[in-house]
């Protein structure tokens, strides 16, 4: 006989403890609020101390801030251990923190230092977060590890070579960890966004102009991807409704990555 249970509306993470890296701004800050609204105790991890602490103070009880440079393993160890000491467990590790290229350029114009910076945060930082989350989840035989990747892992040209390789590493890590950690009841997934206007991506440009350009280029008309679209996708993967979902790259791009522009152009010419 099938059994079905549902958490109270708006409380899909009731009783859960979550760490969200890069949680002081952008996608991370929205995820912090949505996870908190859904009943989770949330630890914000970031290097933007004023923003992170201000968000924790705004949301109040059940939300705290810990400074953490995710490319520094000692910082990550402290983040996880402090969370477990405070709340007694860690249910969800959302490795969301990331950086983009200073200049969106070709491989010919990309210095080695830019590649190393992207790999250090986007790939190695996520690796370290997953490593130390798994360290405390394995004895409990359960847990959820999430990442933010990118739709550039699905279609060429959405990101620079350096950024793309750093995010491909995340998707590869998701698949590898899902295979390794499944025996311990730990699920591992990622969310891959299409372009969206955040403080990091706009870099002083009017967000409305960025959104207009992305909407014009995008496949799904009449909709604009915002941070809550990604945070809600992460919420689904984090909650018990996704209890048998692991090893997946949930691409949130309005169908952009499955579109063949050559075919669409030919179709328009014919008609």
UniProtKB/Swiss-Prot annotation:
Which residues participate directly in catalysis?
A: 150, 163, 167
- Into which EC class is this enzyme placed? oxidoreductase
| InterPro entries, alphabetized | NAD(P)-bd_dom_sf (IPR036291), Sc_DH/Rdtase_CS (IPR020904), SDR_fam (IPR002347)
Q: Which residues form a coiled coil?
A: none
Q: Which Pfam families match?
A: adh_short_C2 (PF13561)
Give the tissue specificity.
Mainly expressed in petioles.
Molecular function terms, GO-annotated = oxidoreductase activity
Instruction: Tell me its EC number(s), please.
Output: 1.1.1.-
Q: Which residues cross the membrane?
A: none
Q: Keywords in UniProt for this one? A: Oxidoreductase
Q: Which pathway does the database say it acts in?
A: Secondary metabolite biosynthesis; terpenoid biosynthesis
Q: Which reaction does it catalyse?
A: 21-O-acetyl-isomeliandiol + A = (21S)-21-acetoxyl-apo-melianone + AH2
Q: What does this protein do?
A: Oxidoreductase involved in the biosynthesis of limonoids triterpene natural products such as azadirachtin, an antifeedant widely used as bioinsecticide, and possessing many medicinal applications including anti-tumoral, anti-malarial, anti-rheumatic, antibacterial, anti-inflammatory, anti-pyretic and diuretic effects. Catalyzes the oxidation of 21-O-acetyl-isomeliandiol to (21S)-21-acetoxyl-apo-melianone.
Stated family: Belongs to the short-chain dehydrogenases/reductases (SDR) family.
- State the protein's name: (21S)-21-acetoxyl-apo-melianone synthase SDR
